[in-house]
Amino acid sequence: MKKIVFTGGGSAGHVTPNLAIIPYLQEDNWDISYIGSHQGIEKTIIEKEGIPYYSISSGKLRRYFDLKNIKDPFLVMKGVMDAYVRIRKLKPDVIFSKGGFVSVPVVIGGWLNRVPVLLHESDMTPGLANKIALRFASKIFVTFEEAAKHLPKEKVIYTGSPVREEVLKGNREKGLAFLGFSRKKPVITIMGGSLGAKKINETVRSALPELLKKYQIVHLCGKGNLDESLQNKEGYRQFEYVHGELPDILAVTDFVISRAGSNAIFEFLTLQKPMVLIPLSKFASRGDQILNAESFERQGYASVLYEEDVNVKSLIKYVEELSQNNEKYKTALKKYNGKEAIKTIIQNISEA
């Protein structure tokens, strides 16, 4: 039986692509383990899936000054030792890393054990963890073709982003019933990220009188951001977040307004949903969402509404443009084959 160790954590975005790949390896009877941090989100997600989980010490990698920067390099070194010992016991044939600060000790520990390491980079430019890890990797899978210019060419394989199978299996009728929506008006799903986005939430709610004339709205507004005064508004459903219902909601969705995190937008792309993308500004991030969104716009999958330009008038304008040019967007979206991503990654894992 072949063995694989997965790693990646710190945010859900460093875990969900692993969850897209794991079921296919389980079908092929791989022995699967996961190495992550002691208290990261990856621990909760992976243990819920029933996959053996091993925790190690890890320090956060920061690009800015923080007193914790003095302590954290020692935690990383301890994490390398923890990972080295654990990998030596597990004896995997291959390690697959999705990035995040916890992945660095695992990648180095794998390399020290002479285990082939495969990385996946979701964004246009590598994050700090993958920048460190890539020198220890034998192959690097990239979500965006443009990412290749930032990485060692001899290691790069373009795959796109692996998408969870359950996301593709939504039921439109169940979605309509869950939302209480009719079939008469198109549905817009609006997502501001797991924590929500104050400016997006406020603008959407201010634009409701105009938007609800032509559309039905699903608003995933983030934890603590519900507006009780709108709970019974016809044609408008708001949720802090959804779990099992998301595939059915996406099956109902005609258009998406969203942040531009790589995993989410590739799910919309695979489902062929035209998008208005509102990337996090450079003030709130390293600018990766802006690059992601602009790439999608160049390929005809989406239009980009920059954070600083978000207001009621611009939001309505972008929604109308999306609606009027729906067929143009759909034609572009059909060119992408999302199923190839998992197929290519599985093939390379098997050959490692």
Curated annotation (Swiss-Prot):
Annotated CDD domains: GT28_MurG
Pfam family, one: Glyco_transf_28
Chain positions recorded as UDP-N-acetyl-alpha-D-glucosamine binding sites: S11, A12, G13, R164, S194, Q289
Molecular functions per Gene Ontology: glycosyltransferase activity; UDP-N-acetyl-D-glucosamine:N-acetylmuramoyl-L-alanyl-D-glutamyl-meso-2,6-diaminopimelyl-D-alanyl-D-alanine-diphosphoundecaprenol 4-beta-N-acetylglucosaminlytransferase activity; undecaprenyldiphospho-muramoylpentapeptide beta-N-acetylglucosaminyltransferase activity
GO biological process: carbohydrate metabolic process; cell division; cell wall organization; lipid glycosylation; peptidoglycan biosynthetic process; regulation of cell shape
Catalytic activity: di-trans,octa-cis-undecaprenyl diphospho-N-acetyl-alpha-D-muramoyl-L-alanyl-D-glutamyl-meso-2,6-diaminopimeloyl-D-alanyl-D-alanine + UDP-N-acetyl-alpha-D-glucosamine = di-trans,octa-cis-undecaprenyl diphospho-[N-acetyl-alpha-D-glucosaminyl-(1->4)]-N-acetyl-alpha-D-muramoyl-L-alanyl-D-glutamyl-meso-2,6-diaminopimeloyl-D-alanyl-D-alanine + UDP + H(+)
EC number(s) reported in the record: 2.4.1.227
Keywords recorded for this protein, A-Z: Cell cycle, Cell division, Cell membrane, Cell shape, Cell wall biogenesis/degradation, Glycosyltransferase, Membrane, Peptidoglycan synthesis, Transferase
Main location: membrane
Gene3D superfamilies: Glycogen Phosphorylase B
Topology versus the membrane: Peripheral membrane protein
Pathway(s) served: Cell wall biogenesis; peptidoglycan biosynthesis
Subcellular location: Cell membrane
One GO CC term on file: plasma membrane
InterPro entries: GlcNAc_MurG (IPR006009), Glyco_trans_28_C (IPR007235), GlycoTrans_28_N (IPR004276)
PANTHER family, sorted: UDP-N-ACETYLGLUCOSAMINE--N-ACETYLMURAMYL-(PENTAPEPTIDE) PYROPHOSPHORYL-UNDECAPRENOL N-ACETYLGLUCOSAMINE TRANSFERASE, UDP-N-ACETYLGLUCOSAMINE--N-ACETYLMURAMYL-(PENTAPEPTIDE) PYROPHOSPHORYL-UNDECAPRENOL N-ACETYLGLUCOSAMINE TRANSFERASE 1
UniProt-listed NCBIfam families: murG, PRK12446.1
Family statement drawn from the similarity comment of this UniProt entry: Belongs to the glycosyltransferase 28 family. MurG subfamily.
Protein purpose: Cell wall formation. Catalyzes the transfer of a GlcNAc subunit on undecaprenyl-pyrophosphoryl-MurNAc-pentapeptide (lipid intermediate I) to form undecaprenyl-pyrophosphoryl-MurNAc-(pentapeptide)GlcNAc (lipid intermediate II).
Entry protein name: UDP-N-acetylglucosamine--N-acetylmuramyl-(pentapeptide) pyrophosphoryl-undecaprenol N-acetylglucosamine transferase 2
Organism field: Bacillus cereus (strain ATCC 14579 / DSM 31 / CCUG 7414 / JCM 2152 / NBRC 15305 / NCIMB 9373 / NCTC 2599 / NRRL B-3711)
